[in-house]
A protein has these predicted regions:
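Charged, amphipathic alpha-helical segments and their flanking helix caps
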Residues: 1-35, 51-152
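Short beta-edge strand/loop motif at the mouth of beta-sheet-based domains
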Residues: 38-42
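A short, hydrophobic beta-strand-centered structural micro-motif
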Residues: 43-50
Length: 152
């Protein structure tokens, strides 16, 4: 029986679900967390692939890779300052959580992703901002970059 290889994006989603901020919102609202598909619900999450050359450096033994992933969230939207502050605060706290996890080297588990991938870091490359808004909700996005080593 062959071993099932898990996509890197699935490992990143599993890691993000360990963030207390996301876990609390999912528990409180029942928010879905999809891969490449943000629903129109008032609160929902999605992680998506971003195009680009993933190879940073080529070595004799393998490659240093980097993949960019937009993290999207559907959130309540209003002209009321309290709602805007809450949305901004969510992404600020998420950015800080990612930075702390990187500093502690608590990175996504890529062991089930095949190819001997070893994570080396994760960073937020664009902070959270509104992409679109309509009818009481908005789509916000934050960009992350996962770096890892993959042997040949």
């Amino acid at each position: 029986m062959s071993e099932t290889v898990k996509p890197t994006i699935a490992a990143l989603r599993a890691w993000l679900k360990t963030c207390p901020l996301i876990a609390d919102e999912q528990e409180a609202t029942g928010a879905a967390f999809r891969i490449a598909g943000l629903e129109e619900e008032s609160t929902a999450f999605s992680i998506e692939d971003s195009p680009g050359d993933p190879i940073i450096t080529k070595y004799i033994s393998g490659w240093e890779m980097a993949k960019n992933y937009p993290f999207l969230s559907r959130r309540e939207y209003s002209e009321v300052d309290a709602v805007s502050i809450q949305n901004s605060g969510f992404f600020e706290q998420l950015t800080e959580w990612v930075m702390r996890q990187d500093a502690r080297h608590n990175l996504p588990d890529l062991s089930a992703c095949g190819g001997g991938k070893t994570p080396t870091g994760i960073a937020v490359t664009n902070s959270g901002y509104i992409v679109t808004n309509s009818a009481g909700s908005c789509k916000m996005q934050l960009q992350m970059c996962l770096t890892y080593y993959m042997p040949k």
